[in-house]
Amino acid sequence: MAHGPRYRVPFRRRREGKTNYRKRLKLLKSGKPRLVVRKSLNHHIAQIIVYDPKGDRTLVSAHTRELIRDFGWKGHCGNTPSAYLLGLLIGYKAKKAGIEEAILDIGLHPPVRGSSIFAVLKGAIDAGLNVPHSPEIFPEDYRIRGEHIAEYARMLKEQDEDRFRRQFGGYLEKGLDPEKLPEHFEEVKARIIEKFESEGARE
């Protein structure tokens, strides 16, 4: 371990790989709410957070589990289509709460062009949330709809059906043919839009 008079011990959350304090300071200086996006292997989570001296306050949040529970999503919750749907959900929740704009906070996730993190951002923007961005960072539309997954499933089924059933067992158990994922994506997307737009009409 480094030592000496010039050595400074990093903050605990930086040592643990949880917070980049330089990036956090830049985000806070914007004065805007943060669209915080985090991912694991199997899920995504999105939150609208504002700074408070006593601790950050979460205004609205969304988890990919909600896609299953409330909108009948049968696909995997760690892929690009589910990430977009989560973004759509958090975007509508933000609008319902009166939040019109935010700035993206991806934490320590690398800013990889076309990644599922940016699929969340695309969904939020399509829902009407104003977030500064460059369109080049978004995944292609065919990936957002899950066409690449459907095509891979089709190829795998033709080449090795046993492997196909192992790899897509989760889909099949829920009654979803992975080759039909793009159509299922559109159905769930329509349910999210219908829910929030019908609520807006009643208000």
Swiss-Prot record:
Gene3D superfamilies: 3.30.420.100. One of its GO terms (biological process) is translation. GO terms for molecular function: 5S rRNA binding; structural constituent of ribosome. SUPFAM superfamilies: Translational machinery components (SSF53137). Pfam families: Ribosomal_L5e (PF17144). One of its GO terms (cellular component) is cytosolic large ribosomal subunit. Keywords: Ribonucleoprotein, Ribosomal protein, RNA-binding, rRNA-binding. The keyword RNA-binding applies. InterPro entries: Rbsml_uL18_euk (IPR005485). Belongs to the universal ribosomal protein uL18 family. This is one of the proteins that bind and probably mediate the attachment of the 5S RNA into the large ribosomal subunit, where it forms part of the central protuberance. Part of the 50S ribosomal subunit. Contacts the 5S and 23S rRNAs. PANTHER family: LARGE RIBOSOMAL SUBUNIT PROTEIN UL18, RIBOSOMAL PROTEIN L5-RELATED. HAMAP family: Ribosomal_uL18_A. This is Large ribosomal subunit protein uL18.
